[in-house]
Regions:
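Cell-envelope and extracellular/periplasmic
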Residues: 54-381
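Terminus-proximal functional modules
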Residues: 1-56
Length: 381
């Protein structure tokens, strides 16, 4: 019996793509369709094969570029559409994460806090999204939880790093977290920040989680290099009367993070923790429309700070000026003929929020968000 396999090849140039495709052809793969430019710096070619094929690149990386993911819900797995681990959300053997939960996946292999484990669509953030399953999910296929962008950021960066290197994601996000409101929670060196931790700031449990896990990722291997921090946060501060304090509190935390990491300067991109870029992502149109003044205060403060190593990445609209898709049912509909079920199929009890347009969709987390974040990392690093 033969099985059909699908995969994608990513490359930084036509010549790079040709070289990689040549290797795949020797392994029994065939091109499927034509190459597509998914970013100005990335070509992608779908490939397919019948029967047994060689799966290349399955060896463990010698070392890792470390990318920290921090902030609140739009920084993590809050995409409600059905996870697609057999296709769009397929893991890659060169992309790992630092563990937090007791098993790699629900009911899967055991792991311990800060182990290096495979990364997938639902990373080990402070808030556990792995049990909020889509009603159409087939858990036997790994379609558990919700969809985030971390895996996809890493996939888009793979063509630009050495073949013996991988990407180690450090997930430290917590939905509903803010600088100016929210429970502080607790921190343990053995388990990280508690799930009820929802307050950012110097010395807070979420900060202790962030800095300790970043250090742990670098301590895993002296060759590991901290490449960037991807930060998406500000929504929950907008609803606070003290929202204007957020920019100063963020800057104080950024300064402290760099100071605390200075002992690892040799493992930081550019040779200093101060040179590691903070890539600060935008939010959905709902927040700007609802809290216009507050949005400008908080997200405006991320802008025009390139000289400080802070880079703002807009997500409000796509290249045609259309609002980036959210979990609103009309923006992530079901497509039964294709076997896809979006946020539209979720109801109370399995939604990430009843206010659907407050969070980006699964498709946005596979496309425009990682495309732009990865491009910003490449431009800044």
């Amino acid at each position: 019996m033969t099985f059909k396999h699908y995969d994608v090849v990513r490359a930084a140039s036509p010549s790079d793509l040709a070289e990689k495709l040549t290797h795949k052809l020797k392994e029994g793969w065939q091109p499927f369709g034509s190459p597509v430019a998914i970013t100005p710096y990335t070509l992608m070619q779908a490939i397919t094969a019948e029967g047994d094929v060689v799966v290349s690149g399955a060896t463990e990386p010698d070392w890792y570029y470390v990318i920290v993911l921090a902030g609140q819900s739009n920084a993590m797995a809050y995409g409600e559409g059905l996870p697609l681990p057999d296709s769009y959300d397929a893991p890659d053997p060169r992309i790992k994460q630092l563990a937090r939960r007791s098993t790699v996946t629900p009911g899967g292999a055991a792991c311990r806090y800060n182990d290096i484990i495979p990364a997938d669509h639902c990373l080990h953030d402070v808030q556990d999204m792995s049990t909020l399953n889509h009603p159409k999910a087939d858990l036997s296929k790994g379609q558990y939880g919700c969809v985030g962008q971390g895996l996809h950021i890493a996939k888009k960066l793979l063509p630009y790093i050495p073949n013996n290197a991988g990407i180690l994601l450090v997930p430290c996000c917590r939905g509903g977290s803010a600088f100016t409101q929210g429970a502080e929670g607790t921190f343990s060196a053995d388990t990280g920040a508690s799930q009820d931790s929802a307050r950012w700031g110097v010395g807070k449990p979420l900060y202790q989680d962030l800095i300790s896990r970043t250090k742990a990722a670098l301590q895993k291997n002296p060759k590991n290099v901290l490449l960037a921090v991807c930060w998406m946060q500000g929504e929950f501060d907008m609803s606070a009367a003290t929202h204007a304090q957020q920019p100063a509190l963020f800057t104080a935390m950024l300064t402290q993070f760099r100071a605390d990491l200075s002992v690892f300067n040799a493992q930081c991109h550019g040779g200093s923790a101060a040179d590691v870029p903070w890539i600060c992502g935008d939010t959905t149109y709902y927040w700007k429309n609802t809290y216009g003044t507050q949005y400008n205060t908080i997200y405006g403060a991320y802008k025009n700070r390139e000289s400080e190593g802070v880079y703002f990445v807009p997500f409000m609209t796509d290249g045609n000026g259309v609002n980036t898709a959210t979990n609103a049912p009309a923006e992530d509909p079901d497509i039964p003929a294709s076997g896809y079920y979006g946020a539209a199929s979720r109801t109370n009890g399995n939604q990430v929020s009843s206010n659907r347009p407050t969070h980006f969709s699964s498709w946005a987390r596979r496309s425009i968000i990682p495309d732009r974040l990865a491009t910003a990392i490449l431009n800044a690093a």
